[in-house]
């Protein structure tokens, strides 16, 4: 029996070795670089980095930004969550798609759109000359908070809406029967029941804000607002390069994120309510007066205009402008910038090819490795399986820039053994490490719906493990594999921070091409690439949803 168990655990052990090499070693290298100097333990450089007034100010900036983004995203999402869960607006499923557009839009593209719209003599002032001077209001901390909140509020909206849908209407009706008005029901009923879900959503938004690089690097730098990610990036890329400071700041950021995850787990266990049971629960739409309905429509349209309309209008119109000096003047529009990307601009075409190659390769490797990981964990009964699964999901808990710094340090250290650093191979490896959790989660979700009796039936009828895997398991989990592949492809195609840190010399991808053109003044060409990037990602997502819906029907 022990011999059989060892054979069953062998794939798990091999995967454990691979994951430790790919994930744990780079993370460990960050902490080692922060405290080991010249081969001996030395905390003084790390302490000096943390006590540096500029770094202390930067840490304060990051925490302040995280809190403000949580507050503003809550103010935006809470009314929408109530409308889409308790009123007639819940019938309009199209809003579920529309309000995911800001979240699916790359943050650096959205922030560029806002910069083009709000800058001096920008698109807003061309449309409304009376708005001159408004750039002084936007290019502040408030503008940065607004742009980042417009990116993450759909996540908060989804969390709150799903939580509200689980609150039985009978509880609200009971409150009304006992004389509680709308405000009292919100205060005494909804808020306590939502506190656990809201805390989880707020902590996740906070961590995502701390981990975000795209918006702080484009808009934050313009207002001189430095945060964790931009400082870590600067220490790792701008001379004099200081990997020690970069590793120290990365360690602090990891510590904050892990504390947030621990706090989330604590809240989940202490502040959760069992609102869904075997007993049926009906949903009753709250009636709305004509004035309230008009106000609700106005709010929904306003949020969509600000979150989707402004950045997309700016990006698309700028990509079509012939001469920037003439702006939105009639006759000043052309598609020449799109034609240039596919004909004259060799770097643009090369960036597209590189992005497609990296996205396809990393998505395929993630699909294979993630599926093998889930299969090995499910098959094994060893205590090691929980550890291996946790390692596979670890990249999701850590900021992407931290993992990339760790990969840089680790693979640079072993360059003489494995000369992968400074090649396209290191980019593929980094993408695989960053996006492996997507496949693991989607395949695991598919596995939870498979009854063990199916496997047992296959064994009873003489099926070998390979036959059962090929004819039973894989057909049942292929949707999860396909979903994980597509999500990895979409996110890898537009990834910015990894490409900006470890791309080989003179190698551009879509994201770095857009940023470079934007910063060097070829804004229209950069925005043309941004439009193609968004169209590519959106089309892939729509294809994915169509395939999933068709399979559900069959």
Can you annotate each of these PLM segments?
Residues 171, 272-284, 454, 463, ...:
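Short cytosolic juxtamembrane segments of multi-pass membrane proteins
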Residues 34-45, 119-130, 221-230, 271-280, ...:
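Peri-membrane helix termini and adjoining interfacial loops of integral membrane proteins
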Residues 175-176, 458:
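The alpha-helix within a helix-turn-helix
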Residues 1-6:
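Short, Lys/Arg-rich, polar N-terminal cytosolic tail immediately upstream
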Residues 262-299:
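Alpha-helical transmembrane segments of integral membrane proteins
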Residues 116, 214-240, 327-331, 490, ...:
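Glycine-rich helix-loop "coupling/hinge" segments at transmembrane-helix boundaries
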Residues 178-180, 192, 461-462, 475:
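Glycine/proline-centered hinge or cleavage motifs at structural transition points of membrane proteins
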Residues 7-39, 51-165, 193-214, 218-220, ...:
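Membrane-water interface segments at the C-terminal ends of transmembrane alpha-helices
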């Amino acid at each position: 029996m022990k011999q059989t168990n060892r054979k069953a655990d062998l794939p798990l052990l091999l995967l454990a070795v691979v994951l430790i090499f790919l994930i744990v070693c780079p993370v460990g290298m960050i902490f080692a670089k922060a405290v080991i100097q010249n081969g001996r333990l030395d905390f003084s450089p790390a302490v000096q980095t943390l006590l540096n007034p500029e770094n202390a100010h930067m840490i304060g900036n990051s925490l302040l930004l995280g809190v403000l983004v949580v507050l503003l995203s809550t103010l935006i999402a809470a009314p929408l969550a109530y409308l889409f869960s308790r009123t007639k607006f819940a019938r309009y499923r199209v809003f579920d798609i529309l309000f995911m557009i800001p979240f699916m839009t790359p943050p650096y593209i959205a922030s560029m759109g806002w910069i083009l719209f709000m800058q001096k003599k920008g698109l807003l002032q061309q449309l409304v000359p009376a708005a001159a001077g408004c750039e002084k209001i936007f290019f502040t901390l408030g503008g940065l908070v607004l742009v980042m909140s417009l990116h993450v509020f759909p996540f908060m909206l989804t969390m709150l809406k799903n939580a509200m849908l689980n609150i039985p209407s009978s509880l609200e009706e009971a409150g009304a029967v006992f004389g509680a008005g709308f405000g009292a029901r919100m205060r005494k009923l909804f808020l306590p029941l939502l506190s656990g879900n809201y805390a989880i959503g707020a902590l996740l938004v906070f961590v995502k804000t701390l981990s975000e690089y795209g918006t702080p690097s484009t808009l934050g730098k313009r207002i001189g607002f430095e945060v964790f990610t931009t400082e870590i990036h600067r220490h790792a890329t701008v001379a004099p390069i200081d990997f020690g400071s970069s590793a120290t700041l990365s360690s602090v950021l990891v510590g904050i994120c892990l504390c947030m995850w621990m706090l989330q787990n604590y809240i989940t266990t202490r502040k959760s309510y069992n609102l869904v049971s075997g007993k049926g629960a009906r949903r009753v739409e709250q009636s709305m007066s004509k004035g309230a309905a008009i106000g609700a429509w106005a709010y929904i349209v306003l949020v969509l205009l600000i979150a989707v309309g402004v950045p997309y209008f700016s990006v698309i119109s700028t990509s079509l402008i012939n001469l920037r000096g003439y702006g939105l003047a009639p006759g000043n529009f052309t598609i020449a910038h799109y034609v240039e990307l596919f004909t004259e601009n060799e770097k643009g075409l090369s960036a597209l090819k590189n992005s497609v190659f990296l996205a396809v390769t990393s998505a395929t490797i993630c699909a294979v490795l993630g599926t093998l990981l889930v299969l090995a964990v499910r098959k094994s009964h060893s205590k090691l399986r929980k550890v291996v699964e946790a390692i596979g999901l670890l990249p999701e808990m850590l900021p992407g820039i931290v993992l990339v710094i760790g990969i840089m340090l680790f693979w640079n250290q072993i360059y003489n053994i494995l000369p992968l650093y400074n090649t396209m191979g290191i980019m593929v490896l980094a993408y695989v490490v960053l996006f492996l959790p997507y496949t693991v989660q989607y395949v695991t979700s598919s596995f939870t719906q498979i009854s063990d009796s199916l496997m047992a039936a296959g064994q009873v009828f003489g099926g070998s493990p390979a036959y059962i895997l090929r004819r039973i398991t894989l057909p049942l989990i292929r949707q999860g594999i396909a979903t994980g592949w597509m999500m990895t492809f979409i996110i890898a195609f537009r990834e910015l921070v990894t490409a900006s840190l470890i791309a080989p010399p003179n190698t551009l991808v879509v994201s770095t091409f857009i940023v470079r053109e934007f910063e060097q003044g070829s804004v229209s060409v950069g925005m043309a690439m941004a439009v193609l990037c968004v169209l590519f990602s959106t089309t892939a997502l729509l294809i994915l949803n169509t395939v999933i819906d068709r399979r559900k029907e069959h």
